[in-house]
Design a protein with these regions (language model features):
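Acidic donor-binding loop of glycosyltransferase active sites
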Residues: 305-320, 337
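Conserved acidic donor-binding segment of nucleotide-sugar-dependent glycosyltransferases
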Residues: 350-354, 358-365, 374-380
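A short, well-ordered alpha-helix in the C-terminal region of glycosyltransferases
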Residues: 288, 367, 374, 381-408, ...
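Carbohydrate-associated surface elements
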Residues: 189, 211
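Nucleotide-activated donor-binding/catalytic signature segment of Leloir-type glycosyltransferases, i.e.
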Residues: 275-298
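Conserved donor-binding/catalytic core segment of Leloir-type glycosyltransferases
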Residues: 224-243, 249-252
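Acidic anion/phosphate-binding donor-loop and adjacent secondary structure
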Residues: 169-171, 195, 212-229, 415
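Short hydrophobic beta-strand element within catalytic cores of glycosyltransferases
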Residues: 329, 334, 338-341, 351
Length: 418
């Protein structure tokens, strides 16, 4: 591998490429277009059969770290032994950090993350040209980045998103913040939470929305300012607890019982698939509900174009997991599809009730059903909300503008970057 003549930004990801993390591949592509040299370190390979088209345009090299200890013990141990012999003091310091973090919660993942970091530093870093490590997600990628920073002497930073914030051990996350050069997060709600957790620390915590590439979401100006039965209702979501799809299904059932003619299309897949499909059958929604699984971008676009309403029932999961601002809300709004969702986490930073959408309390199917019907049937509301929502996304959440703020943060970290 040829070492870049420019300082390289190392991006540490949990998996690459991942269709559910298109916002990360878009960020990398936009940074490259601004002149950044990027190298990707991924903790595992992508598991979907297709990817977003932006991935094909990314020039960054990719190194995949050994994913599991049992199947990769020789490679992990060999490269860690080489590193320990080459840099004994740094390796001893890294072991001390790993031991301290392990003793807090006895999580064996701490050892795996440390060994992955040793592999990264010994096997991957020397030929990469990387001068700064940035991890996407505050849990395992940031753990590997922290250890790699101690073992290599390179600074690290991370972007905190949603689940990685609210399901992480508070003491472990605070230590990551303390040792990082800076932290980025994607909502003001998250930033306030992290600032409280990091009280007394000097690490800068920046709020930069992900946004979307608004050029990829067009419907030819055919906005559905009026809708008529049978209404087409759409959700695009991973099938996990925090998305609140059971609440949506119960709301659809209530509307059906009230004689409202509609069809409901659900795009996405996830660990709760069996539960959700069983609930569809239990509620007798098979005649009006279609589940399509994970779909590529062009298929999702076609469903946006046909939809009269986009709905999500976001809620806090039992383990504390929650959404920030789901990217599908940006997508729906810029496509001219009005949204009804819940007043949870950072969603009100995008959706203003009566102005750019409608919000209801989480876990309330009856309230969700009422809001859905209002947005479907009230032509005046639709005529106000649809253009205002689209304008809000175009003005404040275009990722081509937002990536400039990220670039301003990364540049000082890449000493000598021009």
């Amino acid at each position: 591998m040829t070492v870049s003549t420019r300082p390289v930004l190392g991006m540490l990801l949990k998996g690459y490429p991942r269709i559910s993390e298109t916002f990360i591949s878009n960020e990398i592509l936009l940074l490259e277009q601004l002149g950044f040299a990027v190298h990707i370190f991924s903790m595992r390979r992508g598991r979907e059969s297709f990817t977003h088209e932006s991935v094909a345009r990314i020039r960054a090299g990719v190194d995949y770290l050994p994913e599991t200890f049992l199947r990769n013990s020789y490679r992990l141990l060999y490269h860690n032994l080489c590193l320990a012999m080459r840099q004994p003091r740094r390796y001893a310091a890294g072991l001390a950090v790993a031991r301290r973090r392990f003793m807090r919660n006895r999580n064996p993942a701490s050892l795996r993350h440390f060994l992955q970091a040793g592999y990264l530093v010994q096997r991957c870093l020397p030929s990469s040209g990387v001068v700064h490590l940035h991890a996407h997600f505050a849990h395992s990628p940031a753990s590997v980045a922290l250890y790699a920073s101690v073992l290599s002497g390179l600074p690290f930073s991370f972007t905190a998103h949603a689940k990685d914030i609210y399901t992480s051990d508070a003491a472990q996350l605070r230590e990551k913040i303390a040792l990082a050069r800076f932290v980025v997060t994607c909502t003001e709600y998250n930033r306030r939470h992290l600032l409280a957790l990091a009280a007394g620390l000097q690490t800068p915590i920046h709020r930069i929305y992900h946004g979307i590439d608004t050029r990829l979401f067009t419907n030819g100006g055919d906005f559905r300012s009026t809708a008529s039965p049978p209404y087409h209702v759409l959700s695009v979501a991973r099938l996990t607890e925090k998305k609140g799809i059971p609440t949506v299904l119960r709301a659809v059932k209530q509307l059906q019982e009230r004689g409202v003619r509609l069809t409901y299309t659900l795009i996405g897949d996830g660990q709760d698939r069996a539960k959700i499909l069983a609930l569809v059958r239990q509620l007798g929604l098979d005649p009006v509900c279609r589940w399509l699984g994970t779909q590529p971008h062009h298929v999702v676009l076609e469903h946006y174009r046909r939809a009269d309403l986009f709905v999500l029932g976001c809620e806090v999961a039992a383990d504390g997991d929650r959404d920030g601002i789901p990217n599908v809300l940006f997508e729906s709004m810029v496509m001219g599809v009005p949204v009804v969702t819940t007043a949870l986490s950072a969603i009100p930073e995008l959706v203003e009730p009566g102005k750019t959408g409608l919000l209801v309390p989480p876990g309330r199917p009856e309230a969700l059903a009422e809001a859905m019907l209002k947005m479907l049937a009230d032509a005046g509301l639709r005529q106000r909300v649809i253009p205002a929502a689209r304008e809000r996304v175009l003005r404040d959440f275009d990722n081509r503008a937002l990536v400039g703020r990220l670039a301003d943060i990364y540049r000082p970290a890449l000493s000598g970057f021009r």
